[in-house]
Each structure stands twice: as C-alpha cells, then as structure tokens.
C-alpha cells in the first residue's frame, strides 16, 4: 500500500511541475519572465550588501503596469529598543518614471514586457511606441545605499526629448528612536535634466535611497560604479564552486543559491556577521543559521568575506564559554552587544560544535583549527553533561523553538553531537591532540550512535524510522537528519516516510504529518541525506521538483524560510543548505583532515557526468569530475595542473583524497 501511494504521489507531482513554471532559464546567469503572460502577477525578492538589505515587492497588473515597493533595511542604523529586530526599516513606493516628460508630455502609460533576475532585478518596459525603458534595481555592495539604473532607448526614427526630474528628498528620523540619535534618509536622482535622445541611442539616469548616521554623506557617489561593484561580486561568485550536470535547472538554481548565501553579510561594529534577513534578522548570528547551516559551506565557495564572517561568528560564541557549563546563547544580536536565549537551550552547543569542526577542517588552516579547538571541546563537554539516562542529549527545545513539540531530548541535537564527535576526532588528529582524548571522542560517538537507535528508533505511522522525541507518534520532517551524518540504520523506512504523502507536499516536507506548515531547511537537509544514503533515483526526482518550483515557479529564485510564518522569506542560510545538497550529498565531500577529505560520489542513473569546478578548501583550489564508465564511474580530482586522484570506482564507494602540501 505504501509503495502504491508513493507511485500516486510521484504521478501527481509530475503533473504539478508542468503547471507551475512561470519563469524560464534565460542566458547563462539569469531567469526571465515574459510579462505578457499570466497577469496579474506579484512576487518579492531580497537582495543584500554589507550595509543594506532590500526586500523588493513587484507587481505587474492586468494592464501590464508596474508597482514596486522597496522595503529597505539598514542593519547598522540601530533603533530603540536595540533588540533582534532593531534595524532601521523604511518602505518606498516612489515611481520616478511617472515624473518624466517625453516631448513635453508626461508619460501616460508603462507596459512591462519582461522581468529578469540575475542577482539584480531588471524590468523591461515600453513607454510609448518609440521609447524603451530598462530598470535595474540593486543593493550597493559596501555603502548603505540601494540603487536603480534607468536606461531609456529611442527605438524610433526621430529624436526624442526627455525631461528627467531632479529629485532630492531628505527626511530625518526622531533622535530618541535611534541608538545613535537621528538618522538621515535620502532619495536622490543622478543625471537629471533635459536631454535629447537620437534614434537608436540611449541615456541613463539613476535613483538612490540611502540611510546615514550623523557625519556620513554619500550624495556624490557615482551610481554606475555602484552597479559595477554589484556586477563584480556576482561575477566573482559565478566563477567559483561551479556546478555542471546534465540538468540546467539544478545548475542554475545552485548558481543563484550561491548569491543569496554569500551576499547577506553585514559589516557590523562586532565584525562581519552573516544574517538571515527577511526584514527581521540582521547584524546578528544564530547557532543554527550561521554556526550550523552556512559556515561549513563557506570554505568550499572560497569567498573570503564569508570565511571571515564564519570565523567571527565562532569567536563571538566562544565569548560565552563558562566553567559552570551554562548554555551558550542561541543568538548574539545587535552587532554583538547583546544576546537572545528566549527558547532556552535549543541544542545550540551541538549546532556550534558540528559547524565549527567541519569549518575548521574544510578551511585547512592550522591556526584557525587551534583557535576553534577550545570552543569545540567546550561544546562537546557541554553535550556530554547533558546526556540523559538513555544516553541521548537533553535540551529545552530545538531550532523550531517550540513551534512544534520536541520533548526533553530531540533527534536533531543528538545527531549533530554525533557528527561533531566524528569531526572532532579528525580535527584533533590533524592538530596533534592527545590520542587518548580522541579515542574517547570515537568511543562516545559509537555509544551515541547506539543510543540514537535505541532511544529514537521507532515505527511511526507504519514506517520503520525515528520518533523525534519520546512520546512522538506523528512523522516529523527532521527524521531526515541521521542520514546527513551517515547514520543509515533506518534509511529505507526513513526515505519512504519522507517521500510519502504523509510528509511530502508541493513545497517539500511538512514540518509534521497532517500540518500545512513547512520550513525549507528540513527539506534541504532531507534531500542532502537521501543522496548521502545513495537513493539517487528518488533524490533526483524530488530535488528537481523542489528546484523547479523555487527557481521557476510563482515565488523565485531562492530557497525560502517557511510558510505560513514569514510568507516564504528569502532567508540566506537556506541557500547555503541548498548548495550543500550537492557538495555533501551528490559528491559526498566529507572533511577528514586539514588537507584531506573523503568523496562518496552518487552519480544518478540518468546522468553521464557531474562536475564541481573551482572548489576551494584545504588551502587548495580543485576540480571534481565524475564520468560514467559502464557500470562504474571515473572520479578525477585535479588541483591546478596536478592530478590528485584519477580512478575508475564503484558508484557510491568512498575514496580518500589527500593533498600533499
């Protein structure tokens, strides 16, 4: 019966996919929507720089007119009370196009023809038969400024005179509302004035929105340079950690996810802090989003600012180590000056140890490894002290912070602690730590693996899988997490449960069977775990479904946080989790030393190749190539001109790769 239901679910999903593609792949870096189809339509996207983040809400009405609302966040313009959500936020709906005169007459109508996304929001319109407009909306990379470029092109045979308004609007916030007093918010046009556009020629003008503290002035900024800097960042990200597979949708979704994963880092007075975003979470770090989800990914991307932010996050958490082994706070907020621990101990020490050990190994820097070792040790000892009588880790809650029940001990925390013990054994060996201590970590991991099976292993709703906590009798999305840490005792029943109609929805996994709530993070973990466990057939099927919906569906182009909470915000760390489906799932990359790792490539049956180019890590840049060779695969690891590994192996077998430094 379960197999029958799975076949029905797959059939339904295939039909749904065919109905949900609004967007199309465009050139090698973008997606495009033809705005003459499927009207009206509206969506929102978040874009970020070091000093600003923007949630842009755009709508195209039935008559092809455009409405744009920019919800702008200045994370370092702190408001009172200076809590998690205290970034200065303002919304703007100004439409400068409606202020333009063409041949002495105001524009009567704008017709949107298409919208392109490529790390920028580009809107193509016509203003009359002979005047084309291309808007490009983007955040500044390193200023507290949001920019818009307007390019007007005369497509006719006669010259056109346009008058572009000189907009200069300044407002000041109430001094008593700001941590540093009053803040100035400015809206300004550049290249304004009357200009004649000859046939087949173009002119450009710009609009900016800035937020500043006293003494700051960006009125003389060159907006074309700001756009070039944004393009430079996007180019840098596109040229590192490049995924190539026969499935262009997966390749493109991976490329987009790199953008969102990397752009949301804010230069706070407490150092660079990767922030989730979503109009709520900035200039702060969390043990799950940063320490666990995104930080272990940054070494492979080779994005130095991301690596700097990861190290900074662990350094901040290390400030809260204590001799009494009281919990490290879940979040360090307000540029590092305050904390949040409103959900108690969420298993945060397990999250931190898991991420810090993987990050230190992958970065391959002995100095960083030594610096993070005391934090990792402290977190491991904290978890050891939290073991209950059944040998699993007790905690007050989990990363969902009470939104769903998690009991007194949950599956996530113990699984993360298990992986942290495994990684710490590798790291300790690389750093030359006490062999007896490392033997103890290995012993603890083996005992914990047994305890996870004995305590959490259960038949839930007919599936041979896991209960999430004692007393849990409904399937939960997080039953996937043992698969991601190479615990495969119940992989068949767990994968069957994940892809059953009890859990799988058109938006991925429901948080709990029978509930409409979904959080992408658990779906992203699940897809990684399914590939890690070797079920490439179902893994690829559902990965395609998910990627097609997120990249080309109604709400694009990134993974999201959740629904209904937050209305599918483009939180940043989820994009890092998407990329980890490939690095750790399909390619099975697991760091085992400062210059070594294992690969367990899982080439899907319908693919003849898959590649990751310009992978960073272990103080190297290298390429991974997997080619089908009959019933086997050929795995090649190349670093520069050197072939590090080149063998024909069994698909799904594990190989050890060592760089000779």
Sequence positions of predicted segments:
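Active-site core of glycosidic bond-cleaving carbohydrate-active enzymes
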Residues: 286-311, 315, 370, 374-377, ...
